[in-house]
Amino acid sequence: MLHDQDKDLSDDVRVLEDSLAALGLDRKHCIHTGPLIRRENEYINMNREERRMILTRMMSFIRKAPIVYKCFTLDKKFLSGNTAIHDALLQSIVRFLIDKADDLNQYDRIKLYYDNGQPQVKELLREAFAIYASKTTFISDVHPEKYRLFQAADTLCTLELARFKLQSGEHLSTSEFQFFGGLGNLNKHYFKPISRKLCK
């Protein structure tokens, strides 16, 4: 996800948090999209409509916030081992960064936020951003509950994974199908809106 920090997010965050409070949730409620869909953890006692209302609020935030994103996907069954996966992802990310060089070179600093969830991903990002090493700062002390953009990125990745599964001829999981209510609803209310935020 890319965000120019000169573009203020405070109004978008306030609207999101007001809307969560209107649902009876804590204003600072951290939205975890996977558990929300699967009805796990803090969402275990919520019905589908209650959970969908939460995701609707996050979708509204994503639509209105001054952000864009790029998702890198690959099919592991066509790659032999971790090294091949690493190399394919690295190539895709570096190609994207080179394509976006004119935009990225306008900035004096690039901040890269990652929560250290997977050390191999952190290392992959360090390698990819080596071409901007002199102005890239890695911020790894990232806690999802403190960063709405991190939660938005989680939502986008979850939806893109569902889209990738469908495009690859796989089926949605039972919990995904029950939550989204069919492919028409998924396309109309989720895939189409996030597609407008794809980095061109």
Model-identified regions with their sequence ranges:
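Phosphate-ester processing/binding pockets and catalytic centers
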Residues: 1-200
